[in-house]
């Protein structure tokens, strides 16, 4: 009679392999494919039995976390209309082509503290000076940790007015959506004179309510703020209120040098 214990190592290994395969299947079923692949790869590596519990968890969870974070970032970029935009603020600095005021704006804005604190940013400069580039770069950085959205101001107002006329309940729902965003970017702000009272009301409502909720809004304009009131006809009160909220906290001026 030979003790059955001599076969235990092999049987234990088979049981462990079976259990690992079950865990891999369960992870795949939970749509945790990176964790499943990591666990399977680690188990078949020579160092598997030498890993302590914490190291094992780090190596199994790490790739899944990075994958999920990357997917969330890409999804946020698409929803924000920022996919394919500039992903770095490195080019937003004084050069032979353009200058920025204040000079320390990059250090101030790159932290994105203005979003967390609900402060508005106004980016001013002539056409093709780099306003959109800076705003989009900030928006893309924001998508790592915040919900953002980029719009051309005129298109935004036209769409919102049309929705308000067609279905007021859907309009209200859309307004609530914009109020929940951590960052709203309105490019080409007041590029042309607004004569439609409905557009003025929409712009005022969004700016006013976001300000009340301490939600950050970035506006980009090639016009000096002191001329904005003349761009919003027949409603001086709303014009002044919009001006006050858009320029209340932080202003960046881009000046071409050529």
Tell what function each PLM region has.
Residues 146-147, 180-183, 211-219:
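Loop/turn-to-beta-strand initiation segments
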Residues 110-118:
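Phosphate-binding P-loop
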Residues 139-151:
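Post-Walker A helix-loop "phosphate-sensing" segment adjacent to the P-loop in P-loop NTPases
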């Amino acid at each position: 009679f030979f003790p059955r214990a001599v076969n235990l190592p092999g049987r234990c290994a088979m049981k462990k392999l079976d259990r690992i395969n079950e865990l891999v299947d369960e992870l795949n079923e939970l749509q945790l494919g990176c964790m499943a692949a990591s666990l399977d790869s680690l188990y078949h590596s020579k160092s598997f039995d030498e890993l302590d519990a914490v190291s094992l968890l780090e190596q199994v969870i790490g790739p899944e976390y990075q994958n999920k974070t990357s997917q969330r970032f890409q999804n946020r970029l698409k929803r924000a209309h920022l996919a394919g935009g500039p992903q770095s603020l490195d080019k937003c600095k004084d050069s032979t082509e353009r200058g920025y005021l204040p000079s320390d704006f990059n250090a101030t804005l790159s932290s994105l503290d203005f979003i967390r604190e609900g402060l508005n940013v106004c980016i001013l400069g002539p056409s093709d000076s780099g306003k959109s580039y800076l705003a989009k770069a900030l928006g893309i950085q924001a998508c790592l940790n915040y919900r953002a959205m980029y719009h051309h101001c005129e298109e935004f107002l036209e769409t919102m007015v049309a929705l308000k006329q067609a279905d007021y309940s859907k309009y209200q729902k859309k307004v609530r959506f914009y109020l929940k965003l951590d960052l709203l970017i309105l490019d080409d702000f007041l590029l042309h004179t607004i004569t439609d009272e409905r557009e003025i009301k929409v712009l005022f409502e969004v700016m006013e309510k976001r300000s009340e909720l301490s939600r950050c809004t970035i506006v980009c304009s090639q016009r000096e703020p002191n001329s904005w009131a003349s761009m919003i006809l027949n409603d001086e009160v709303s014009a002044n209120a919009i001006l006050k909220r858009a320029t209340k906290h932080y202003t960046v001026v881009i000046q071409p040098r050529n």
